[in-house]
């Protein structure tokens, strides 16, 4: 076991079930899982996060839509997709969000790609970026200086979710297509710090 794995042992724990309402085959994880199918599962339909924040993905190898999974119970897909407007009834891969630090999170939003144009510095949650002074519905690039964030397509933490971490891509997302493997738009209207 690597020293990194030893350092995080116990900080992250997730239990997954193959069926809704915590039924069927189950398995506990303390580390990332690039493909639940390699563990003999067809899909994940319910989840219990016991410690640490996690991000779940629609497809194997951390591809597809992202869904933030913070401490709590997720008996059905609606619990993790929330008001996303995007329906995915299962997850096929997941990993811990190791750099989440709710008390020390900083990010800068930019109106143009490559960190150009008008910028907006963040250190708090914003259920509506426009209500807080961001002039438009789009964010073309983001620099995460500390912690981890989840950005949403619409106000009120709704729509597609993009998990943005300081320790991924050095915290630099130069264009919206780097927000996730399935980033369909640069429309971001709410953003919050990930709870640890």
From Swiss-Prot:
Biological process, per Gene Ontology: lens development in camera-type eye; visual perception
Region (N-terminal arm): 1-11
Keyword entries, A-Z: Eye lens protein, Repeat
Transcription as UniProt keyword: no
Entry-linked Pfam families: Crystall
Start and end residues of each stretch annotated as Connecting peptide: 99-104
Keyword Transport annotated: no
InterPro entries in alphabetical order: Beta/Gamma-Crystallin, Beta/gamma_crystallin, G_crystallin-like
GO molecular function per UniProt: structural constituent of eye lens
Superkingdom field: Eukaryota
Sequence ranges assigned to domain Beta/gamma crystallin 'Greek key' in this UniProt record: 12-51, 52-98, 105-146, 147-195
Free-text comment about domains: Has a two-domain beta-structure, folded into four very similar Greek key motifs.
Protein family (similarity comment): Belongs to the beta/gamma-crystallin family.
Alphabetized PANTHER family for the sequence: BETA-CRYSTALLIN A2, BETA/GAMMA CRYSTALLIN
Subunit annotation: Homo/heterodimer, or complexes of higher-order. The structure of beta-crystallin oligomers seems to be stabilized through interactions between the N-terminal arms.
Function: Crystallins are the dominant structural components of the vertebrate eye lens.
Protein name stated in the entry: Beta-crystallin A2
Organism: Gallus gallus (Chicken)
Upper classification of the organism: Eukaryota, Metazoa, Chordata, Craniata, Vertebrata
């Amino acid at each position: 076991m690597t020293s990194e794995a030893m350092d995080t042992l116990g900080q992250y724990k997730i239990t997954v079930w193959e069926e809704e309402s915590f039924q069927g085959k189950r398995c506990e994880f303390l580390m990332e899982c690039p493909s639940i199918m390699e563990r003999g599962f067809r899909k994940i339909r319910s989840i219990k996060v016991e410690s640490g924040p996690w991000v779940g993905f629609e497809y194997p190898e951390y591809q597809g839509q992202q869904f933030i999974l913070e401490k709590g119970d997720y008996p059905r897909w609606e619990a993790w997709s929330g008001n996303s407007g995007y329906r995915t009834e299962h997850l096929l891969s997941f990993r811990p969000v190791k750099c989440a630090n709710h008390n020390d999170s900083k990010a800068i939003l930019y109106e143009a790609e490559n960190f150009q144009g008008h910028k907006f510095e963040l250190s708090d949650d914003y259920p509506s970026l426009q209500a807080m002074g961001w002039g438009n519905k789009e964010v073309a690039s983001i620099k995460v200086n500390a912690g981890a964030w989840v950005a949403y397509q619409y106000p009120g933490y709704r729509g597609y979710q993009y998990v943005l971490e300081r320790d991924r891509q050095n915290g630099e997302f130069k264009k919206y297509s780097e927000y996730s493997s399935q980033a369909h738009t640069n429309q971001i209207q709410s953003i919050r710090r990930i709870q640890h």
